[in-house]
Amino acid sequence: MTLRIGHGFDVHRFGDGDHLMIGGVRIPYVQGFVAHSDGDVLLHAICDALLGACALGDIGRHFPDTDAAWAGADSRDLLRHVHTLVMAAGYAVANLDATVIAQAPRMAEHIPAMRACIAEDLDLDTTAVNVKATTSERLGFTGRKEGIAAEAVVLLMPTGTT
């Protein structure tokens, strides 16, 4: 077995609500996400990166938005489930790097809590989890404050068991 790299991307538009779930953290905001689950773009991007690194498809295959069982699902539960699939495939997360792209709300004060949630769910030290945020300089849908996007890259290492 060799090292594996995975990349994930997710986006959700804003809709009715009073908070956003990002990185497992509840962030007060004037809107919520339009989504089948809790809409956590960051955790969804991480799930896709993990699944991609193991050639296990994508989040839509494992948690389809046509399945009522996942309606309103806590994305931390999804991430923990994906982590079990990664481990069953004989891999462990070496590290991950993720970016949240949003004009608003500001993410900086929430990043330490996001890192802690992700590290806990993936059984990692927080030093192996990096989360950063950027704007799109008022360009595109994120710049117009119509939604938020996130990207994630993960490095997996073999555990020696399959």
UniProtKB/Swiss-Prot annotation:
Catalytic class of the enzyme: lyase
Keyword line: Isoprene biosynthesis, Lyase, Metal-binding
Matching InterPro entries: MECDP_synthase (IPR003526), MECDP_synthase_CS (IPR020555), MECDP_synthase_sf (IPR036571)
Function in brief: Involved in the biosynthesis of isopentenyl diphosphate (IPP) and dimethylallyl diphosphate (DMAPP), two major building blocks of isoprenoid compounds. Catalyzes the conversion of 4-diphosphocytidyl-2-C-methyl-D-erythritol 2-phosphate (CDP-ME2P) to 2-C-methyl-D-erythritol 2,4-cyclodiphosphate (ME-CPP) with a corresponding release of cytidine 5-monophosphate (CMP).
Enzyme Commission numbers on file: 4.6.1.12
Reactions performed catalytically: 4-CDP-2-C-methyl-D-erythritol 2-phosphate = 2-C-methyl-D-erythritol 2,4-cyclic diphosphate + CMP
Biological process, per Gene Ontology: isopentenyl diphosphate biosynthetic process, methylerythritol 4-phosphate pathway; terpenoid biosynthetic process
UniProt: 4-CDP-2-C-methyl-D-erythritol 2-phosphate binding residues: 10-12, 36-37, 58-60, 63-67, 102-108, 134-137, 141, 144
MF terms in GO: 2-C-methyl-D-erythritol 2,4-cyclodiphosphate synthase activity; metal ion binding
Domain of life: Bacteria
Cofactor(s), names only, from the UniProt record: a divalent metal cation
Free-text remark on how the cofactor is bound: Binds 1 divalent metal cation per subunit.
Protein name in the entry: 2-C-methyl-D-erythritol 2,4-cyclodiphosphate synthase
Site features described as Transition state stabilizer, chain residue numbers: 36, 135
Entry's family note: Belongs to the IspF family.
Natural source organism: Chromohalobacter salexigens (strain ATCC BAA-138 / DSM 3043 / CIP 106854 / NCIMB 13768 / 1H11)
Pathway given in the UniProt record: Isoprenoid biosynthesis; isopentenyl diphosphate biosynthesis via DXP pathway; isopentenyl diphosphate from 1-deoxy-D-xylulose 5-phosphate: step 4/6
HAMAP family (UniProt xref): IspF
Statement: the UniProt record of this protein carries the keyword Metal-binding: yes
Chain positions recorded as a divalent metal cation binding sites: 10, 12, 44
Subunit structure: Homotrimer.
